Amino acid sequence: MFLIVGLGNPGSKYDNTRHNIGFEVIDNISNEYNIDINRQKFRGVYGEGFIANNKVILLKPTTYMNLSGDSVREVANFYKISNENIIVIYDDISLDIGRLRIREKGSAGGHNGIKSIIANLSTDVFPRIKVGVGQPNIDLVNYVLGKFSKEEKEVLKESIEVATNSVEEIIKQDVNSAMNKFNGFKANKSI
């Protein structure tokens, strides 16, 4: 069983913000694999289904970004999911819009949602898919909570699709296979 977590902040005022790209990827996975995310528990909204004949749980924590680890820990403990089978998808300001980076472990890199997950799982060994949202030219908080432009949304459509494919590759093969296949991905469209 795999737990696939998209990081973001709950509430419509955060829709289409850079910090919520993880939620957008989860929504895309939900549509692609017909997995309804309609249950509330574990301080999040989630749904169960299958990807590549493996049972998966799609989770969007509703704790706000900085406490995401609370929700992840509750689901992982309840379903007895090992860290290696927890895939976390989130925004990365160090990557240009339209780029992806997959890692099997590592530090939080200044991302508070990842910092919370590492603290709650007591490990930094879990796969993650970083979706580039670009470098801020304004205050960091205003940037990550800011909305994407129409042009940025067009570029991100491709990134979201490839992030979805990356999740399937991790499940079917492993993290290294996904890294070899998708690391360095850059959307064909540019801004």
Curated annotation (Swiss-Prot):
Q: What organism is listed for this UniProt entry?
A: Clostridium botulinum (strain Eklund 17B / Type B)
Q: What is the protein name stated in its UniProt record?
A: Peptidyl-tRNA hydrolase
Q: Where is this site: Stabilizes the basic form of H active site to accept a proton?
A: 91
Q: For this protein, what is any one GO molecular function term?
A: tRNA binding
Subunit-structure text: Monomer.
Which positions bind tRNA?
14, 64, 66, 112
Q: Taxonomic classification, please?
A: Bacteria, Bacillati, Bacillota, Clostridia, Eubacteriales
Recorded catalytic reaction(s): these are: an N-acyl-L-alpha-aminoacyl-tRNA + H2O = an N-acyl-L-amino acid + a tRNA + H(+)
EC identifiers of the protein: 3.1.1.29
Where is this gene product found? Cytoplasm
GO cellular component terms attached to this protein's record = cytoplasm
The free-text function statement in the UniProt record for this protein reads:
Hydrolyzes ribosome-free peptidyl-tRNAs (with 1 or more amino acids incorporated), which drop off the ribosome during protein synthesis, or as a result of ribosome stalling. Catalyzes the release of premature peptidyl moieties from peptidyl-tRNA molecules trapped in stalled 50S ribosomal subunits, and thus maintains levels of free tRNAs and 50S ribosomes.
Q: List, alphabetically, the HAMAP family matched.
A: Pept_tRNA_hydro_bact
Q: Which family does it belong to?
A: Belongs to the PTH family.
